[in-house]
Amino acid sequence: MGRGAGREYSPAATTAENGGGKKKQKEKELDELKKEVAMDDHKLSLDELGRKYQVDLSKGLTNQRAQDILARDGPNALTPPPTTPEWVKFCRQLFGGFSILLWIGAILCFLAFGIQAAMEDEPSNDNLYLGVVLAAVVIVTGCFSYYQEAKSSKIMDSFKNMVPQQALVVREGEKMQINAEEVVVGDLVEVKGGDRVPADLRIISSHGCKVDNSSLTGESEPQTRSPEFTHENPLETRNICFFSTNCVEGTARGIVIATGDRTVMGRIATLASGLEVGRTPIAMEIEHFIQLITGVAVFLGVSFFVLSLILGYSWLEAVIFLIGIIVANVPEGLLATVTVCLTLTAKRMARKNCLVKNLEAVETLGSTSTICSDKTGTLTQNRMTVAHMWFDNQIHEADTTEDQSGATFDKRSPTWTALSRIAGLCNRAVFKAGQENISVSKRDTAGDASESALLKCIELSCGSVRKMRDRNPKVAEIPFNSTNKYQLSIHEREDSPQSHVLVMKGAPERILDRCSSILVQGKEIPLDKEMQDAFQNAYLELGGLGERVLGFCQLNLPSAKFPRGFKFDTDELNFPTEKLCFVGLMSMIDPPRAAVPDAVGKCRSAGIKVIMVTGDHPITAKAIAKGVGIISEGNETVEDIAARLNIPVSQVNPREAKACVVHGSDLKDMTSEQLDEILKNHTEIVFARTSPQQKLIIVEGCQRQGAIVAVTGDGVNDSPALKKADIGIAMGIAGSDVSKQAADMILLDDNFASIVTGVEEGRLIFDNLKKSIAYTLTSNIPEITPFLLFIIANIPLPLGTVTILCIDLGTDMVPAISLAYEAAESDIMKRQPRNPQTDKLVNERLISMAYGQIGMIQALGGFFTYFVILAENGFLPSRLLGIRLDWDDRSMNDLEDSYGQEWTYEQRKVVEFTCHTAFFASIVVVQWADLIICKTRRNSVFQQGMKNKILIFGLLEETALAAFLSYCPGMGVALRMYPLKVTWWFCAFPYSLLIFIYDEVRKLILRRYPGGWVEKETYY
């Protein structure tokens, strides 16, 4: 990854070879990035390192040389991912998906108006109005959804940290603070506890340095860093520090071996931004829906075009009819309805701590069938907590809950007093200042995670650790190092004025080796074989729980030999460190969050497979997986079965094990077929010790199985997987910027349980969108049939274009949106995730219900009203057939009705427009029933109840609007709507009732005979 690595990725070299095959090149680069990190700097000796980078290991680079390298390599910063320009985003909203249908409609309208204007003397302006309205609808809705997304991305931008990072470099022998962006390859850099590592470093000297690699590898434990080469894999060796990880304690010096995009972190970020993102399921649904609607529209249009030519219309009139029918089929209000429904759900999710970045992701979460979750910080609290102690030869359980409501143990034993004193004194962690009023478990600490856990545990059970330290002042200490694996300090004893106590903690087996006695019930007894076995059992048991175990021992130094003021020498040890007294063990774990087990259970009953993918140890990963229920009670892995039957693992049939823990190093050597085999045959899977590249491979594996995959994660290492998944979920509090950019949704409270709420909302909106669409499409039939009869039977036009718009954009809007607030019919979280291949948003059954059944009854209601009004005015239905040409003839002012009365053109038109208004009112009346039956797809409306207040408001609103349009003075001029006799409103009532009864009977049959032909034909 050093100087030579820059050339591996030079795109220029590859493009020349494939003759500009951009796509191939991109795939090649992605495969490059998917490979594990390749570098050899960690294997070089210090002299070789100095030669390779032409740098003096004590004085650093010269200023001039640093300038040259900076000019050559560019600044040490990650290239920001290519963002979509705002105007492109806006155009996507304006011309994407559903809007295209409306645009085509608008263009056809202008076309028809153009034809009419050219051919007729006094063309009607209907088509012009219609075109303008359609265009306006698209533009307004487009602006609305653009505004919604812009709002989410505003919140996103506020996450970015604006503080420029500083780095401490040595150049020409002088230490200097520079901006981290100016660090170059070969620079000599110093880091200390609390710093962010400014670039990839090869360590050349260190003092107790530990780094937190969790954002890169997912290990929650701080890792020691020292100059020794300890591992072939650069990610595991101790002598490399990675860009943007944090140094937790100690100090180190290192040589920069890679900067910016060439760092390990940079490669992962590049990998994430280079991934092709698939379309969201809802986008595909809407596309499928548009194809269906367009199919119906074109079929109707063309068949009536041919029919009108046969009936002897001129081809021009036939074209106008064709356009009219296609436009009448376009549900103008639906685009707005879908957008508003998704927005409402997004807002509801934001209140429940899920921030959705793009509206379409709302539904994706509902169709999720696999969740790949990160462990650290998502399933767990991301803070080490003391879980168990072993003293007086028994294991005691500590309280690991978030709100301190869990187990307590007997604190009266003198051994516990001794153990808590060692844990408090032999400990360098401290609480940061000014947090007195915050609960202990929530306080920030300075120091190593394990020590902080001990500090909090002792503070909670024994009171102030600071006072304990003040009463027992420290006189000497040896900090923890990796060779002797212990930490030791000597304190003046508060309980005897002359003497000192030596306290020590460290790796349990190392501590036990230094002890000759053990403290039981406050008395020292010799450490015999029996006690050693007891220790061994306790150590194995706690280790097997995936916990990190520390041993504690002490020695009361005799005051005769070591009086107060004695100079302890920690280099030439002038005090005993053997024959100590063993006191006990304490073990720590990063405990699961309180709400997670419940959430995992809900996922399981919802048919969602939860897979844990973590960089942590297999044992810890398995322990947490069992703790949160990802591996459920009684399910065994191959290893468990082998241990139970006492046979080697190779003899167990892997198919017998439901659960499975896969190690990253095994995953590395697997073919995709083997991975598919694992994903297929095991229901409960944990991947441990995985690298970021492997996360990506796992996600792709799940997608090959046809799953819709959600991935949660917070580290930079999760970003490629977040981007590749169908929906990426990042953590709002602990998440890194890179992961938030790659994600589609952000959990503001970092809680896995919020995902379950998201799934529920996503499933609900899918159901409710179906209902909304069914409701909206139904009124299409009573809008189209008048036009068809006008062509075939030559009757006066029963319903005008303007009135159609009043229905689609006026009365139908609020009721359609109100269905988004409808409560779930059954327990949504008990059914399997929908299959995107078979379970579509709009299917043939929905179309047949809306168009073929309910829509037809509605049309009958409208025509009934139309014929009643004309008959009351003297035109009986028999007289109307074939009257159209005379009726629309301006020069004909003496048209006779069935009773011989003569009608002028103006009088006829008033009656015609009154009919339009009445037809419109009838549609409103039958849409009442349609709205109520659309509340449920299977249950009876009486089971569901009328709890949806918005829906009741919608019913009242559409009625009030219809009445207003009919009776408001001046409407006759503006929209050609005329006042109606009260009785005419009631003509459609029987049809409304018929719709309600028809559908209730249908749903009754559905419930009585599940899977019968009624369900096959009508259950949408």
From Swiss-Prot:
CDD domains: P-type_ATPase_Na-K_like. Mg(2+) binds at residues 714, 718. SUPFAM superfamilies: Calcium ATPase, transduction domain A, Calcium ATPase, transmembrane domain M, HAD-like, Metal cation-transporting ATPase, ATP-binding domain N. Its main location: membrane. It is found in: Membrane; Cell membrane. Residues 1-31, 212-231 are annotated as: Disordered. This is Sodium/potassium-transporting ATPase subunit alpha-2. The gene is ATP1A2.
